[in-house]
């Protein structure tokens, strides 16, 4: 109140990354469920302004086209990787520490499948992101090449969820492999780091 009269002091809320977070007129922040990352939230009233940094951690699992809907069951959260070297997948592309432009999403991840594996999980993880993709490893390019490799190419939405949340940063990429005939046990490749 001022002079016994109520005065409206509702601030104007803004964010610098509305693709990750929106703020209502009442100041309630809501994630968009499309990407994560660091967001600066600012409240302005007249000539006054205050800002705060908010970190949005985006986590979700995608079942890639071609993989059965129950494919994630091959990788229970409570399981740990096995030690059978013959079953372990191995990265072919990209090389560790590869840096990609954020707007180039047609990256074809490629790996040796390991013995008996037909289910694969790629997890892209940082302090802002945890995106898991479960796939059967089939891709037309790899099939045509006849190499027998497992492959995955992110869609634009998946790539944006990974890259936009980590500008000038990096993510760890883990690759797990399992067999549909023995769900619950899986093997893991060495971890990759990729940057943007």
Protein language model features and the residues they cover:
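Signal that preferentially marks extracellular ectodomain short beta-strand elements
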Residues: 28, 139-170
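Contiguous beta-strand segments within globular domains
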Residues: 87-115, 151
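Extracellular fibronectin type III
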Residues: 182-194
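Proline/serine/threonine-rich low-complexity linkers at boundaries of modular beta-sandwich domains
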Residues: 61-88
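Extracytoplasmic soluble-region selector
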Residues: 1-71, 117-119, 161-162
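Solvent-exposed loop/turn segments flanking beta-strands in beta-repeat/beta-sandwich domains
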Residues: 87, 113-133
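Short acidic/polar inter-strand loop motif in beta-rich domains
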Residues: 48-50, 177-185
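Short, aromatic- and glycine-rich surface loops/edge beta-strands on solvent-exposed regions
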Residues: 37-45, 166-179
